[in-house]
Design a protein with these regions (language model features):
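Non-catalytic propeptide/linker segments at domain boundaries
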Residues: 58-60, 65-163, 346, 350-397, ...
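Active-site-adjacent mobile loop/cap segments within catalytic or ligand-binding domains
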Residues: 249, 254, 328-331, 348, ...
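Short beta-strand-plus-loop segments that form exposed binding edges in beta-rich domains
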Residues: 332-343
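Active-site microenvironments of hydrolase-like enzyme catalytic domains
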Residues: 377-380, 384-394, 402-502, 534-557
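Pro/Thr/Ser/Gly-rich low-complexity, intrinsically disordered linker/stalk tracts
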Residues: 585-627, 676-694
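Beta-strand-rich modules
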Residues: 656-676
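A glycine-rich, often tryptophan-bearing local segment used as a flexible ligand/cofactor-contacting loop or short
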Residues: 817, 821-929, 936-937, 972
Length: 982
């Protein structure tokens, strides 16, 4: 800003009068200032009044769309004074968007007075995991946040069909794309910081669902049917106005004491898998604030305290757990209060996400979709007789899709929200109902609490809400990030029910935009575009009566934006920026110090030391956040085929345990501090066989998560065929491959959106990515074969000079290197995920030169090794060289020699079971190499072996597929191990 002042003093050193009131000169000055801050509209000056030393300027809203500090405002006034009056002594007032510019300084730059902060009285949180061995006092503990990813499938009445709300482009659709931030990243980050996060869409991708009602539960103690309604399992689809929480009953404890506590046990019958667990109950004036719930999942016990003074009559999320069919070790129970003053009620428990169950049909006087910023058309309510109503209902159809794909309108109906909330248009337009309802739903959640005391609702004290969208539009460079807030509500009131000014919406918007833009520029894209801070009347920004913003993160239509936006690392960074913006905004309101949760640990390894196992790891430094330093760690353990325990807290980056022989141990670690917990690191595994056949070291070298590969020329461009994203864990945004690569093809309709348009054949299921648990998968088969094993991250070998992991045949009879889809990936200036870095090559060379046995597998073990030194390593030590890419589309492998004859198949398409191999390398044997298996369609090698054990040398077997993608992985893996260990 100082440089801007100097520049314009030199240019416009004469007085305003000497310039003959040249409004254009002043306009140019202000526009230069605005362009330094954001990509926004041009400043237009409506009026300039000069009286003595007083200058008053009124402009359009452009100046209000940038983030301004107090220093910026001061310097701007001095600049205007210098231009208009010829000196800096003027008293300058500038109005933009009906605000004096000084009123637009946010708490990002300058703390507000206590009288202008949004605070709520301390209450018992809605849900608390009481098994967690940590707290987050300087995180978001005790805070409640409502948020949602945009859109979802909805029923389009004019065509009587279920449709996306946005276009299918660049392998995704906005309806699911924003969910790929909220579901795997943003919501867990907020929850790890201690927040309770409430969403108006299903959060579980599990399509199987079972709701166990209280009438199906096992009761211990004295319970009675409560007054009023409760949940009842629908006998058919939900039709217009149906509310399943008004069709049944709930139960309430009658009498209990410490010796004879009542208990209700809900036992499902489920196929083995992971399921979200939701509970429901009825809120009474004397409801317990600490109702005790226990989730028994594969024999592990996790306990929760639920504040039943809020949230009655809807689904309350506890967590996601692994269950199997053993009923004695898989159930949910709730225990009576036993304090004589408060009561516990219970209604039902829901396991899994399920399929959409709301059936819709065309209504009289339905109308076409109307944007959120526009007024709705006027229409009369048409009368319809009962016969016509029944006929219409008979034609009602469900989406036929998993519930997590559907729009918020339908989740609200299924979860007991009154139709006065979600049926905004009297059922004339589901699209409008959906976007209009989300903000009203926020107010219903907060109704009765200190956040919204005058409205009826669920009594949840919300501290903030977020509507998360992406935008449209095409540019050569980055479209970037827009934030929308509204300074008044539907009644034109500029304060929240708490009495605080809604200008705090601007503060939250500024925190979020600033954090996203700064983090993206620091890590990935120095030119990431900062767009406007818009004070605009969109329903999701206007309706909520708590601090609320609407985020338009990037353009899902723009190829440059999506080069970054399809990369899970970018989505992690942006989600972390959003989490940090909530953290900083809320702590600013309370005047307290925040601590940012750490990043996940790295360089993890398990070492066997006689009869004990030592787990080691390292903290990951966050260069952007000095408070994100770990002060403790949580070590999680899973044995055999069970579920994870609740963790053991340690203060140093090491953990030693004594394993039982014959028991498999899977270990992962999270880093913690006063701000909460990081994501869990990768899963390693260890096992000591009762009768040991040999010792194996499993090396996990598959660390890649990335977007697809892109290409472009002057006209055409897009995602390379047979190049898929590698999601983090489970991806929810991929719907199909791109088929329009012509940049000249413009958007016409969402069904004909031009450049970047894609298929949607994968829209109905998530796609498995890098699950970071492959040592456990390999270890299970090794244990069944009688081998002991430990495992390590590749970084513990390649990045730690003092690593405890060294490769020696005296320590390990066999080394199993997992490379999966590891491959150099270029994003901007970043080139990560090289298949076999030099340090790994050095370690393997040492091991093999001393007679070691090596199993190596990965889809790109040749194509990513074509540099001079890399190619020499594979040629001379591993006895293969690169032949071709895309060696198999059918996913067939024919065994030729060494292993038992047969044909194996592997996954080549995105699926919800295991990461696939879409473009395997074809290999060619070099001197001493043996073709063990081929891809029949290309007649090139899929596996190359080498056996020099007769001369006291090494033995290797190298597979050019992601071995884990094989449909019969255990058999193929076992045969590979058997041959190597002969």
């Amino acid at each position: 800003m100082q440089r801007t002042i100097l520049l314009f003093v030199l240019i416009f050193g004469m007085s305003w009068h000497a310039l003959a009131l040249d409004k254009q000169a002043l306009t140019d000055t202000l526009n230069a200032l605005v362009r330094q801050h954001a990509y926004t509209e041009s400043v237009k000056i409506h009026s300039v009044r000069v009286k003595n030393k007083y200058v008053t300027i009124r402009t359009n809203r452009a100046l209000s769309t940038i983030s301004l500090s107090a220093n910026d405002v001061r310097d701007l006034r001095l600049l205007v004074s210098q231009i208009v009056l010829g000196n800096n002594q003027g008293k300058v007032t500038i109005y933009t968007d009906d605000y004096e510019i000084g009123e637009l300084v946010t708490s990002v730059h300058q703390s507000r007075s206590k009288a202008n902060r949004y605070t709520l009285p301390t209450t018992t949180p809605w849900v608390t995991n009481t098994s967690h061995p940590y707290s987050a006092k300087q995180g978001l503990e005790g805070k409640h946040i409502a948020l949602w990813g945009s859109h979802g499938q909805y029923f389009h009445q004019p065509t009587e069909s279920w449709r996306w709300q946005r276009a299918k482009v660049w392998t995704t659709v906005e309806d699911l794309y924003t969910t790929s931030y909220t579901m795997p990243f943003l919501v867990p980050m907020l929850e790890n910081a201690g927040a309770v996060v409430v969403q108006p869409r299903e959060r579980d991708t599990q399509t199987y669902e079972q709701v166990v009602d209280d009438s199906q539960a096992t009761l211990k103690g004295q319970w009675a049917i409560g007054e009023g309604a409760g949940w009842a399992n629908p006998t058919t689809h939900l039709l217009e106005g149906d509310n399943p929480f008004t069709k049944g009953r709930y139960i309430v404890e009658v009498k209990c004491d410490e010796k004879n506590k009542g208990e209700v046990i809900y036992t499902p019958t489920l196929p083995a898998g992971e399921y979200a667990v939701y509970v429901s109950y009825n809120t009474q004036p004397n409801s317990s604030s600490k109702a005790q719930y226990t989730v028994m999942h594969k024999g592990q016990k996790t306990t929760f305290s639920v504040n039943q003074k809020m949230g009655g009559g809807t689904w309350v999320y506890l967590g996601t757990f692994a269950f199997d069919s053993d009923k004695t070790n898989n159930y949910v129970s709730v225990t009576a209060a036993a304090n004589g003053k408060e009561i516990v009620t219970t209604d039902a428990v829901k396991f899994g996400g399920g399929m959409g169950s709301v059936a819709r049909y065309k209504q009289p006087n339905s109308f076409e979709n109307v944007p959120s910023s526009k007024d709705l058309p006027e229409s009369d309510v048409a009368m319809i007789d009962s016969a016509e109503l029944l006929a219409n209902q008979a034609n009602a159809i469900t989406s036929g899709l998993p519930r997590y794909i559907e729009a918020a309108r339908y989740w609200m109906q299924y979860s007991g929200i009154p139709d006065s909330i979600y049926n905004y248009t009297d059922s004339k337009n589901d699209y409008v109902d959906d976007y209009a309802a989300r903000g009203i739903w926020v107010n219903y959640l907060a109704g009765g609490s200190a956040a919204n005391p005058k409205e009826a609702g669920l009594n949840i004290p919300l501290h903030a809400s977020l509507a998360f969208h992406t935008d449209a539009g095409v540019r050569k460079d980055v479209v970037g990030t827009l934030l929308i807030y509204k300074d008044h509500d539907d009644e034109m009131c500029k304060t929240y029910p708490t009495g605080k000014s809604r200008i705090l919406n601007r503060d939250l918007a500024d925190y979020m935009q600033t954090q996203i833009v700064e983090d993206m520029r620091a890590i990935y894209v120095p030119e990431w575009t900062r767009r406007q801070l818009n004070n605009s009347s969109y329903a999701e920004a206007r309706h909520p009566k708590v601090p609320a913003v609407l985020l338009e993160l990037l353009s899902h239509q723009n190829m440059t934006d999506m080069k970054y936006g399809l990369d899970p690392r970018v989505r992690f960074t942006i989600s972390r920026a959003m989490y940090k913006s909530f953290l900083k905004f809320i702590h600013e309101q309370y005047g307290t110090e925040y601590v940012v949760q750490p990043l996940p640990v790295n360089n993890m390894a398990i070492n066997r030391q006689a009869e004990t196992m030592k787990v080691t790891w390292q903290a990951t430094e966050d260069a952007l956040e000095p408070t994100a330093t770990p002060t403790y760690y949580i070590v999680y353990t899973r044995t055999n085929d069970g579920d994870w325990d609740n963790g053991t807290r340690v203060t140093t980056p090491a953990y030693t345990f004594t394993p039982e022989k014959g028991t498999r141990y899977d270990i992962c670690v999270a880093a913690g501090n006063a701000g909460g917990l990081s994501f869990k690191g990768e899963t390693l595994s260890a096992y000591i066989a009762p009768e040991e056949k040999g010792k194996v070291l499993i090396v996990n070298g598959f660390t890649r998560v990335s977007g697809p590969e892109w290409w472009s020329d002057s006209i055409y461009g897009g995602i390379r065929p047979m190049s898929h994203t590698v999601p983090y864990g489970k991806g929810v945004n991929y719907i199909g491959e791109v088929y329009d690569f012509d940049s000249r093809n413009a958007w016409k309709t969402d069904d004909n959106c031009g450049w970047g348009m894609c298929y949607s054949d994968h829209m109905d299921h998530p796609t498995v990515g890098n699950t970071f648990d492959y040592p456990a998968l390999h270890g299970k088969t090794l244990a069944e074969m009688g081998y002991s094993y430990v495992s390590t991250s590749v970084a513990a070998i390649t990045s730690s000079p003092d690593s405890l992991i060294t490769l020696s045949p005296q320590d390990y009879d066999l080394v199993d290197v997992i490379l999966g889809k590891q491959k150099t990936y270029i994003m901007g200036t970043d080139t990560s995920f090289h298949c076999m870095p030099a340090q790994l090559q050095h370690a393997l060379t040492h091991y093999l030169q001393h007679g070691g046995r090596l199993l190596l597998s990965g889809a790109h073990i040749a194509s990513d090794m074509q540099g001079k030194e890399d190619a020499a390593f594979t040629k001379n030590l591993l006895h293969y060289e690169f032949r071709t890419t895309n060696a198999s589309k059918t996913g067939k492998i024919r065994i030729e020699r060494q292993l038992p004859n047969g044909v194996y198949t592997f996954r080549t398409e995105p699926n919800d079971t295991m990461l696939h191999t879409e473009n395997a390398d074809g290999l060619f044997p070099t001197e001493g190499g043996i073709v063990v298996a081929r891809f029949p369609e290309a007649n090139v090698a899929a596996a190359i072996g080498h056996d020099a054990t007769a001369e006291g040398g090494s033995k290797t077997l190298c597979w050019s597929i992601m071995l884990e993608s094989a449909h019969n992985f255990p058999a193929l893996y076992q045969q590979s191990i058997n041959w190597l260990m002969k």
